[in-house]
């Protein structure tokens, strides 16, 4: 089977067009030449898209089922937390004298211990905020205030005030229900 010069030109022109394939694609080309003439040629082109960031993000997110629970099944145990506050603050500060550096460190330590003991109660879906203030007891007055936006049906707090001969301490635990 002989090809005319015109048909050879069209085949060569068609082959040149197929040669411009993007570097992202996979292509193969086979050609057999016998005595300088093209005997058979075949070309396949496949294309693969690059994965986009949007595809990766949609695969990584985990959808959780709605619980349709609007309030806590078990309310925050304020009385139990009051006992924890009293025990921890009293045990740490009963015999201490006021020293600024020591009290600065004690506020951090006491708040971490209180938070750990309240978390051990395993009350689900409550966010805990623990704040401890320690100051020198020297015939001065102090006003400590806190403000928060919360639901009075489910959110609550617990507070304890401690005094000895040289210092005072105020420990607060705020419990905010996560819906």
UniProtKB/Swiss-Prot annotation:
GO terms for biological process: microtubule-based movement. One of its GO terms (cellular component) is cytoplasmic dynein complex. The gene is DYNLT5. Belongs to the dynein light chain Tctex-type family. Coiled coil: none annotated. Interacts with ZMYND10. One of its GO terms (molecular function) is dynein intermediate chain binding. The lineage of its organism: Eukaryota, Metazoa, Chordata, Craniata, Vertebrata. This is Dynein light chain Tctex-type 5. It holds the Pfam family Tctex-1. It comes from Homo sapiens (Human). Changing residue 49 to D: May act as disease modifier for Duchenne muscular dystrophy being associated with earlier loss of ambulation.
